[in-house]
Amino acid sequence: VGKCMAQYLEPYCDEIVYDNLGSVFGVKKSKKENAKRVLVITHMDESGLMITKINDNGSAEFIEIGKINKQYLPGSRLRVKTKTGEVNAFVVGTEKMVIDFGTYSKEETLALGVFVGDSAVVDGAFVKVQKQCISKALESRVGCLMAVELLEAVKDKEFDFDLYVGACVMEEVGQRGATTATGLVKPDLGVVLGCKKAKT
């Protein structure tokens, strides 16, 4: 997502900057010396799962990372990120949910490159439903879109402040990315872009 953000922001700014965690910002510089700094920020990470144990039958136990509505997890397809790539899996169970890799032993799962500490995200396609859309991580992706469109809308405008527009990481786990981003930019004013989930 960070690479995509940089690619989409780049045509509308003077430079792209990153913080140490991977947050990315397009910078529109003012011609004014020692200009104030305005930071417009959203987040680009998404909630997910982390593997905590691989069972003898090949399934894996997990914890949630970020805000996950557990009632939607059973039957969900997952993409598990390993050191060597990605592995497809799905969630089984209701009360005691586990990740199923289609394996029958711990050894088979380990042979896929899956280990304790690996993370997983729900694998959901973007779907249009009449005048609405459904997708995983839409809440963060809409914020990213707003950031890009904002920078595009002001690309030909001159400001007496430096404008930083972009997305941070690790919002789902304590807003750490916002902390490092503000440390990098040191803004005089900050604006947060975001949206809320649909009412159900």
Mark where each language-model region is.
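N-terminal hydrophobic/helix-forming segments and targeting peptides
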Residues: 1-200
